[in-house]
């Protein structure tokens, strides 16, 4: 007999002892679609990166220069909008559906205002950003254009992220997964026509003329922007048309409430600060890498893309951990919150250990997907093998942080990530890069991720993350 998250939440609210098989079933029901989504999304990103990579190392380096800045801006926004999903999970766990829909409505207002403001900010600084990051003058025009076009799509990217995370909080991991996969497929299709010029291709023995704009790096950015627009619109459409606890067609107020603002500050501000701390450290790391030459920049950027094959599975399980722990806390079941957190964390460590082995063995082949440059492949494979050793503990930190955030302990996650990233990774990278180049930077990364996993496991075991209690 299958059981849904909604049914399990009802059992928790009644104070019943939930069988372990039901717990495992719900964990798998939420985790598997998210993991498969992340795998498909990662595969599409591989294809996307390969399309740019085959233009040349300079094109890859242009995007790599601003990639950490896209992480910074989107990461801060994601930290804020994830606080709405955490509120929804806890309210649904407490069977406060009206409050959950109220949070959804307020998130729509937030996305419209903040998303447009962020887009304007990104476009405004795009002309100067590559220079601030120390990019070679030959890379700055493409890097600037990429960041400006990407920034313009932020309102849609926020919409897709917010509404998809809320659907997961309600126990539906399949729909947002399908939307995300479709978005990535569209990104690849758009890029196929926008990046490359009109050209002759042989398909099944037939010579065909394939139309293309030949916009290169700006074309890649536009493809991503258009795909985000479709994804955000679809996610909103699901919430408008589908019946269920989050159906916004049901009567309710659009008024901004004090409780929502308090929870946004309590949970969202530390999440945004955490993303800012991590991403700004990445910006500084990119600046360190920028001084190591075009080959190192390209190998670093493509290596990050290749590594995502490992850690994206962890982020899929993190989505499930956040929803499950959030609903358990809302139902006032600390015992179930602990059970969910350890089950999900163990799953994350196991899967990322396996993918880490695969990354170590097939590192050259992974790099070869993205570029034909032999020097970039050799250097990228070397640093990927260093990073593979840290994947299990990286998985522990990813999933444990999701569980803690579901309980409202975003401040604890922020502190651990801040200490780890700024105290360990940046310090080591600064010391090692002048002597060991990109290899030194990635050794610093691998060591830091291992220590971060240890810190999160210690906090998870101590249990103080549950003392934050349910939201207002």
Feature locations, PLM:
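Small-residue-rich hydrophobic transmembrane alpha-helices
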Residues: 60-120, 157-176, 286, 299-363, ...
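Transmembrane helical elements of multi-pass membrane transporters/channels
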Residues: 29-48, 149, 160, 227-231, ...
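Short alpha-helical transmembrane segments in multi-pass integral membrane proteins
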Residues: 1-34, 88-155, 186, 202-268, ...
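Helix-terminus/linker motif at the lipid-water interface of multi-pass membrane proteins
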Residues: 39-61, 130-137, 193-197, 207, ...
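N-terminal transmembrane alpha-helices
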Residues: 18-50, 54-55, 68-87, 112-119, ...
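Alpha-helical transmembrane segments of multipass membrane proteins
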Residues: 46-50, 128, 162-166, 188-193, ...
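Residue-level hotspots within the lipid-embedded alpha helices of multi-pass solute transporters
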Residues: 38-39, 75, 115, 119, ...
């Amino acid at each position: 007999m299958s059981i849904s998250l909604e049914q399990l939440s009802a059992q928790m609210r009644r104070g019943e002892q939930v069988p372990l098989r039901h717990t495992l079933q719900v964990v798998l029901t939420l985790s598997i679609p998210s993991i498969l989504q992340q795998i498909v999304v990662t595969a599409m990103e591989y294809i996307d990166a390969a399309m740019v990579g085959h233009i040349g190392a300079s094109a890859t380096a242009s995007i790599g220069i601003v990639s950490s800045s896209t992480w910074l801006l989107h990461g801060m926004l994601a930290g804020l909008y994830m606080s709405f999903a955490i509120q929804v999970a806890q309210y649904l766990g407490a069977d406060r559906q009206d409050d959950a829909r109220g949070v959804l409505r307020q998130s729509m207002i937030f996305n419209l205002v903040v998303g447009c403001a962020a887009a304007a900010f990104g476009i405004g600084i795009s002309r100067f950003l590559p220079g601030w990051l120390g990019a070679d003058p030959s890379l700055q025009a493409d890097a600037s254009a990429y960041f400006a076009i990407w920034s313009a799509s932020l309102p849609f990217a926020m919409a897709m992220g917010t509404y998809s995370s809320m659907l997961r909080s309600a126990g539906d991991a399949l729909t947002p997964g399908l939307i995300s996969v479709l978005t990535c497929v569209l990104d690849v299709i758009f890029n196929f026509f926008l990046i490359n010029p009109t050209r002759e291709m042989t398909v099944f023995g037939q010579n065909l003329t394939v139309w293309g704009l030949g916009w290169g790096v700006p074309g890649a950015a536009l493809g991503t922007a258009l795909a985000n627009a479709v994804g955000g619109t679809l996610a909103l459409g699901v919430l408008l048309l589908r019946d269920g606890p989050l159906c916004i067609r049901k009567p309710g107020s659009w008024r901004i409430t004090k409780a929502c603002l308090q929870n946004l500050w309590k949970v969202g501000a530390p999440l945004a600060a955490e993303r800012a701390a991590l991403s700004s450290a990445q910006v500084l790391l990119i600046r360190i890498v920028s001084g190591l030459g075009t080959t190192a920049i390209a190998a670093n950027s493509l290596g990050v893309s290749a590594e995502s094959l490992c850690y994206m599975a962890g982020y899929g399980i993190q989505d499930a951990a956040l929803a499950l722990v959030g609903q358990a806390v809302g139902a006032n079941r600390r015992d179930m919150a602990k059970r969910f957190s350890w089950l999900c964390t163990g799953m994350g460590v196991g899967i990322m250990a396996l993918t880490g082995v695969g990354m170590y063995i097939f590192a050259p082949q992974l790099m070869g997907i993205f570029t034909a440059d032999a020097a970039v492949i050799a250097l990228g494979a070397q640093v990927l093998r260093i990073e593979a050793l840290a994947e299990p503990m990286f998985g522990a930190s990813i999933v444990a942080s999701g569980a803690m955030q579901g309980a409202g302990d975003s401040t604890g996650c922020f502190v651990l990530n801040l200490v780890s990233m700024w105290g360990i990774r940046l310090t080591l990278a600064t010391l090692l890069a002048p002597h060991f180049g990109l290899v030194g930077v990635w050794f610093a990364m691998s060591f830091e991720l291992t220590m971060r996993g240890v810190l999160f496991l210690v906090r998870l075991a101590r249990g103080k993350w549950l003392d934050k209690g349910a939201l207002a």
